[in-house]
Amino acid sequence: MHLDLRLERALERVELVTGVGTRDAGRMCVMSLVACLAGEEHTDSPACASPLIRAFAIPLNDNMPHTVRQRLKPFAPRILGTQDGQDTVRAELLRQALSQEILPKLGGGRQAAQARRFSGALWRVWSLLGMRRLEREAEWMMDRAVALADGTDMARAIAAAGSVGRLLARAARETTDPREADRLWDLAVGLLDRMCDVGGVRPSASQAWALRLEQVFESRTARGMPTATVRP
């Protein structure tokens, strides 16, 4: 979805934060931002959004570094309207990504980490234990992937989607290699992008969405409150 300039500028004024945030302060999570655009009450469970996407996106939002989290803002208009009956397709997409992309990548990262030579014995033990925790979690996630394969059990698929999001977030946070963390966050954002693409192009109401955000900041100005800025 192409963002028009007015909506893009309105989104720039929003600060994405952990938790549901405070709409009146211009600080929201990606899902409460979706609710704001849709004209819904302040919530991180907007009725207009795919529950599967929500389950995957929230652990990403809450675990990303602040600057990386801001990359999720353009997804809010794309998530709006994804409550479209296409979550079975999204579940299969996520299942394939888990088995073909995520778990192989984590396995490779684990082996590389174990092969490194660290300077201290305690550091070696800590790193090895951390990677083994990820290995066990990855093996458990492969079992959870069965839930994603069965689109008739969407409650389990939604729970598994949340687990995939948490696994990616944990791997990105625990790696000691900043470049590997960036690659994992890129993988997570790419998966969100692909899930939003399911269902094709949805009708855009960018002017109405921009207006709702502008009203948030106009209200702040009227009360003499500073507008939210994104921290460097």
Predicted regions span which residues?
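Short, Gly/Pro- and small/polar-rich lid/capping loops
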Residues: M1-T18
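Generic preference for hydrophobic/aromatic residues in regular secondary structure cores
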Residues: R13-L16, V30, L192
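Structured binding/interaction patches within domain cores
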Residues: G39-P232
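A short, ordered amphipathic alpha-helix with a cationic face
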Residues: V20-D24, R132-L134
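Active-site nucleophilic cysteine motif
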Residues: R23-C36
